[in-house]
Amino acid sequence: MIKQIKRKKVKKNVVVGVVHIQASFNNTIVTITDLGGNTLSTGSAGAVGFKGARKGTPFAAQLASEKAAEKATEYGLKKVEVLVKGQGSGRETAVRAIQNSDIEITAITDITSIPFNGCRPPKRRRV
């Protein structure tokens, strides 16, 4: 039988990174990358344990960003720039949860795409 070679996973030491927060009405996804765009950690409301309509709540976004920040601090992350996309309810709480962790925020930018009269939007909901 051939012996398998086990390679040790090299932990990168990253000091500066970027936090991408994608907040839709149904879910909030937090991805923390280095400046090159390589993913260090991710967190989403579904991965934390929420299902269905509860994934879109601000509390779920808070727990998702706390989990992602906790994983990213293992890489030695100290300063981040925050990029927020979408108009979901978890936008502010996700940013606030990262502020409360050990990571210092240098800039907060909104990168939500707005059409210059592009595609026709879906019809209005009648509830």
UniProtKB/Swiss-Prot annotation:
InterPro entries: Ribosomal_uS11, Ribosomal_uS11_bac-type, Ribosomal_uS11_sf. Its main location: plastid. One of its GO terms (cellular component) is ribonucleoprotein complex. Coiled coil: none annotated. Belongs to the universal ribosomal protein uS11 family. The gene is rps11. It is found in: Plastid, Chloroplast. Keywords: Chloroplast, Plastid, Ribonucleoprotein, Ribosomal protein, RNA-binding, rRNA-binding. It comes from Heterosigma akashiwo (strain NIES-293 / 8280G21-1). This is Small ribosomal subunit protein uS11c. PANTHER family: 40S RIBOSOMAL PROTEIN S14/30S RIBOSOMAL PROTEIN S11 (PTHR11759). GO terms for molecular function: rRNA binding; structural constituent of ribosome. It holds the Pfam family Ribosomal_S11. GO terms for biological process: translation. Part of the 30S ribosomal subunit.
